């Protein structure tokens, strides 16, 4: 476009979920309830872990760090989406869009590394139980969590710097409900091959290497479990890892479907539904997956909030049932 007057885009318009006006208020209510559920669940986990000395162990330290991440994660996306549903205010400034993209990308990258750290914790617990407290110390846990956040936010800063240097002109309509990389680059009117290459390389590093580390940990865990002679021992070992493995499977399945496929840059409506899975639904399901069948945590929650054991299980089960009913409705 050299030699031509180029009007740079100063604001973007988020298409969101085009529906009838009446349905916008219903979607606002559904996502508001989901957002509140995420806040309540994850805050309850953080408060329970930090107030119960019986939970001052590496597994629960990682869990509380994950809960902190989930609160930040959903708070980056949902408030702007709720504003669009309620006030029909779908504009977002260029700086606001880049900021939202930066935090979203940072939190996704951080979660990848944090899940790999949690897989290592499970590996040591299953394969080296007698040396667990020697190998997985509080200092190591702090270093792993710190490395997860530092690496995630540093890599994302590089990615967003390259993306923000691209010129955007002409159409400013983002066919999405938040600022994601693919729909943003679709609006570029200058060559963005460098930004795309940098994004691909960094995404490969931060997604694939933690995934390989997680898979390697579970390969060793599987071999160790198969060597356990008793069925009861096998079941206990599997139960120790089942929650984390479920979360890893859901998280990476959604990410790989969204970004590791041909023509991912074509922003289609189906992408929005997958994005809802890992930006809104996953943060509310993760605490339930980790804690619903964890008797130790439910007992600590009972002591922390003065609830009976049956009440804790009943409220968690009711919350999961209500959430599934809400999101079984078509958007």
From Swiss-Prot:
A single Gene Ontology CC term: cytosol
Glycan-carrying positions: 5
Originating organism: Homo sapiens
Stated name of the protein: Olfactory receptor 6B3
Keyword Membrane recorded: yes
Matching SUPFAM superfamilies: Family A G protein-coupled receptor-like
Disulfide bonds: 97-189
InterPro entries: GPCR_Rhodpsn, GPCR_Rhodpsn_7TM, Olfact_rcpt, Olfactory_GPCR
Topological domains, Cytoplasmic: 47-54, 121-139, 218-237, 293-331
Domain of life: Eukaryota
Annotated localization: Cell membrane
Keyword list, A-Z: Cell membrane, Disulfide bond, G-protein coupled receptor, Glycoprotein, Membrane, Olfaction, Receptor, Sensory transduction, Transducer, Transmembrane, Transmembrane helix
Protein topology in the membrane: Multi-pass membrane protein
CDD domains per the UniProt record, alphabetical: 7tmA_OR6B-like
Protein's job: Odorant receptor.
Entry keyword Transmembrane: yes
Transmembrane region(s): 26-46, 55-75, 100-120, 140-160, 197-217, 238-258, 272-292
Extracellular side: 1-25, 76-99, 161-196, 259-271
UniProt family annotation: Belongs to the G-protein coupled receptor 1 family.
GO molecular function: G protein-coupled receptor activity; odorant binding; olfactory receptor activity
